[in-house]
């Protein structure tokens, strides 16, 4: 088992995949979760998050069209992250920037990954599409159908038990 781990940690393909996942987390996942958690804390209606979900898709398209805003050593979190805030793990980002020249397929894999993520994002958020039911709903209708910004209350066995008890 140790040899497998050693081999994986010294495999260019594995390193490339891990670097792509980590930089995606820094650019999209962490900022998204921070925003959704903030919306939950503010008791914001999930049905009002359509514009934010469109922003996520647009941000992924921006990186697809110009991945250098994310992977050059002079890249700024101001344009590279979804929220324009500092990196969650700046040391990880710097390490990835150092590794990029040694990973010959990094940029292509990054763009391919972001394209797949954007396609999936569009499919998962289709109910927020302009002209759709949620987009066309009035504020009163959205209030009547209010939903929390996260599904945390229903996650896991404890969440299911809690829901059952109420």
Kindly label every feature range from the protein language model.
Residues 8, 19-27, 35-39, 80, ...:
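A sequence-composition feature that detects small, non-aromatic residues
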Residues 1-76:
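A eukaryotic "domain-edge + linker/cap" signature
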Residues 28-31, 35, 59, 63-67, ...:
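Generic recognition of well-structured, leucine-rich alpha-helical segments
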Residues 1, 101-166:
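Amphipathic alpha-helical/coiled-coil segments positioned at domain termini
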Residues 5, 9, 18-21, 47-49, ...:
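Generic detector of leucine side chains in alpha-helical contexts
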Residues 65-125, 129:
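Low-complexity, serine/threonine/proline-enriched polar segments
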Residues 18-21, 25, 29, 49, ...:
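Generic preference for well-ordered alpha-helical elements
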């Amino acid at each position: 088992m140790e040899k497998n781990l050693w081999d994986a940690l010294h495999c260019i393909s594995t390193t490339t995949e891990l670097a792509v996942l980590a930089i995606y987390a820094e650019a999209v996942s962490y900022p998204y979760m921070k925003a959704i958690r903030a919306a939950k804390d503010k008791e914001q209606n999930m049905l009002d998050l359509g514009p934010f979900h469109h922003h996520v898709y647009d941000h992924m398209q921006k990186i697809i069209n110009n991945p250098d805003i994310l992977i050059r050593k002079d890249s700024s979190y101001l344009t590279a992250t979804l929220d324009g805030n500092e990196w969650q793990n700046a040391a990880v980002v710097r390490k990835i920037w150092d590794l990029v020249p040694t990973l010959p397929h990094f940029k292509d894999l990054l763009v391919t990954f972001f394209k797949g993520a954007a396609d999936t994002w569009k499919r998962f958020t289709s109910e927020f599409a302009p002209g759709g039911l949620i987009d066309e709903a009035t504020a009163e209708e959205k209030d009547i159908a209010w939903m929390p910004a996260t599904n945390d209350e229903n996650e896991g066995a404890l969440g299911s038990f809690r829901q059952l008890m109420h």
